[in-house]
Amino acid sequence: MGAGALGVVAMVAAAVVVAMAGANSEGDALSALRRSLRDPGGVLQSWDPTLVNPCTWFHVTCDRDNRVTRLDLGNLNLSGHLVPELGKLDHLQYLELYKNNIQGTIPSELGNLKNLISLDLYKNNISGTIPPTLGKLTSLVFLRLNGNRLTGPIPRELAGISSLKVVDVSSNDLCGTIPTSGPFEHIPLSNFEKNPRLEGPELQGLAVYDTNC
């Protein structure tokens, strides 16, 4: 075998190693999530941590490079809490965990998911504040956090996400005022309702941000 052919083989082998390493780290992150969840219906039985990559697991979608791009875990009767390891899924585009009984807080590490398009955590039992780090999600289009127990203000950092089209934080316990700049100019007020302590400049004139937080 010539030097050129050997070089090609080495490059292919290196690419395979890199792909496997990425898949393993993503598998580790998903295994951490599984350990933190209670799964009475056994919907995560296929999540076998001994496999080389998680792309064969149910409710997980991967791209052609075997990188996880989508988690479809909505409405599966899951409970437990989210884990910071989710922030290692750096190719993830869709995180769907709506209509479960997820508790605890939103990990600030989710702000590392630079390719995330949709973050759907609505209708759970999530508490704590909305992490300002979500403002780093520059590809985000859909942010649905309604129907939880979130407190604190709506982070101003979210107003800097130019791609954001849908924001729904209704039915929480948020406080302060509703941002009106950037994408928030076009978000209907109904997407902020049922937050008794949340005020909107549209209703209050020139309200000062975080007036009652």
UniProtKB/Swiss-Prot annotation:
GN (gene name): LRR1
Induction: Up-regulated by wounding and upon pathogen infection.
Topological relation to the membrane, as annotated: Peripheral membrane protein
Family matches, as SUPFAM superfamilies: L domain-like
Keyword ATP-binding: no
Keyword entries, A-Z: Cell membrane, Endosome, Leucine-rich repeat, Membrane, Plant defense, Repeat, Signal
Subunit architecture: Interacts with HIR1.
Stretches forming LRR repeats: 90-113, 115-137, 138-161, 163-186
Membrane is among the record's keywords: yes
One Pfam family per UniProt: LRRNT_2
GO BP terms, alphabetized: defense response
Function description: Involved in plant defense response.
Secretion signal span: 1-21
Protein known as: Leucine-rich repeat protein 1
Any single Gene Ontology cellular-component annotation: late endosome membrane
Annotated localization: Early endosome membrane; Late endosome membrane; Cell membrane
Predominant place of localization: membrane
Protein species of origin: Oryza sativa subsp. japonica (Rice)
